[in-house]
Amino acid sequence: MKIVITGTNGFIGKNLLNELKDSNEILEINEDIFNVEDWYNEIYYKLNKFDPQVVFHVGACSDTLETDVNYMMTRNFEFTRRVAEWCQLLGRKFIYSSSAANYGTNDEYPSNLYGWSKYTAEQYVVKCGGVALRYFNVYGPLEDQKGKMASVAYQMLEKQKHGQEIKLFPKKPQRDFVYIKDVISANIFAMENYHENMGQWYEVGSGDERTFEDVLDILEIPYTYHDEKDIPKGYQFYTKSNPMNWMTEWKPQYNLENGLKDYLKHI
């Protein structure tokens, strides 16, 4: 099968590429596409020349602290819009990597530019008949290039490696930590069951809310706590996927304990 994957230099895209490359013909599209002045026509040229049956659109600016509106919307909305329209026009499968950042701090509206860019793109994808997957807190192998956007598990392991003190917020934030292998299985499930799920968004998570303390206790990493006054304004203290919003018949296979155990084999 001929498949396009965007963002294969990134964490999720690289894992998806590794899963699919041995049995499919893959075209990779990455950030360097924006080095071309007429980048949107360059995208159409690549898509038309390769003529894929499936497009996994994983690539995006994932920096939740980015404040440049033009930069963010070009990469996260305009790029998505053009690929979604191409897939709709030619009847190709389009699977979009969305985000739980769509929910913001009150489950209603995104609370930052990244969240808004992903939310607006997701709404367009659904309108075009694609499948959007809202990932929660993804962790796993190959996330080292994410820097400050890497998972809590990766960042804490790095701090331990370099002998740095680890401090947590005293209010005990809870997150839905989802292992990368479950994210990849959700993408493949969406591809294989596309027509039943097209024109919809779905959540991809473990379905469990766990604390940062849980992560560190499983990894056997010691920690202390910040003062209450150190908590950033607007900090999100709770996320959890709802199994009612998962794709029918798709289920995660890893809880936090099993996911971290498998993760440690790759570090």
Predicted feature descriptions by range:
Residues 26-46:
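Adenosine-cofactor binding site in Rossmann-like domains, unifying the SAM/SAH pocket
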Residues 39-75, 104-105:
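NAD(P)H-binding glycine-rich loop region in Rossmannoid oxidoreductase-like domains
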Residues 57, 81-113, 131:
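Conserved Rossmann-fold NAD(P)-dependent oxidoreductase catalytic core, especially the SDR/UDP-sugar
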Residues 113-115, 119, 123-175, 180-184, ...:
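NAD(P)-dependent short-chain dehydrogenase/reductase
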Residues 71-82, 112, 116-117:
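Glycine-rich NAD(P)-binding loop of the Rossmann-fold in SDR/ketoreductase-type enzymes
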Residues 3-20:
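N-terminal Rossmann NAD(P)H-binding glycine-rich loop of SDR-like oxidoreductase domains
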Residues 163-267:
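C-terminal substrate-binding subdomain of Rossmann-fold SDR/epimerase-dehydratase oxidoreductases
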Residues 9, 61-63, 99-104, 136-142:
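Active-site segment of SDR-like NAD(P)-dependent oxidoreductases
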